[in-house]
Amino acid sequence: MINKLIEKIQKTHAPIVVGLDPMLNYVPEHIQKRAFAEYGETLEGAAEAIWQFNKEIVDATYDLIPAVKPQVAMYEQFGIEGVKAFKKTVDYCHEKGLVVIGDVKRGDIGSTSEAYAVGHLGKVKVGSQQFAGFDEDFATVNPYLGSDGIKPFIKVCKEENKGLFILVKTSNPSSGEFQDRLIDGRPLYEWVGEQVDAWGKEHMRSEERRVGKECRSRWSPYH
């Protein structure tokens, strides 16, 4: 999957990703009015406004950029209607040929981590059938619970030819409270980065890695 992203970057000459992080008060007023006229000032109306704005952003940029990164929590705040808008956004971005990085920052262990991995990158079994959930191309994950939280994602990535971006050093102001703490003279995030690199090498297929490191900076039409 990383090869697909690299190819898209090379084709567009744009090593960037557009964040789709819904903030209703940033959605243009005419889009809000149209959505509220149809669905009322409800969660459904808010989700429709977000979806329509996302669609306009994608329509304006899909041939200029390689990838988008919708932030799932910003959709979840609108309940099930927001989650539906997230899925519609993912599907539409795929239709337009974009790589989709699900900014989900999952970080749990065991069966919970497995469920997150299946839900975002894999397929869930229902009787004799299998269905993709959100079906992003990549997911962001938090490694600070250890390998228990990462290995289920790597397993699904290998099965489905998907990829991960693993948080190593984040840009939030308080990140240094833990990530910069010294262990044997080196900050914790360097140790984590080395482990992420090892996971990537361990699970390479020819020249392709399924695991990448993420050091945070971003731009979004919503900011």
Q: What is the role of each PLM region?
A:
Residues G212-H223:
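Positively charged, low-complexity/disordered segments
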Residues M1-A60:
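N-terminal glycine-rich anion-binding loop in soluble enzyme alpha/beta folds
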Residues V18, V68, D103, A139:
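Conserved, mostly hydrophobic/aromatic
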Residues K87-D108:
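Catalytic PLP-binding core of fold-type I/II PLP enzymes
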Residues D108-E207:
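Conserved anion-binding
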Residues G19-N25, A73-Y75, K105-I109, N142-Y144, ...:
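Active-site beta-loop-alpha junctions enriched in small/polar residues
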Residues V58-L64, E95, I154-E159:
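Acidic (Asp/Glu)-rich catalytic clusters
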Residues A46, P70-G82:
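Glycine-rich, proline-tolerant flexible connector loops at the mouths of alpha/beta enzymes
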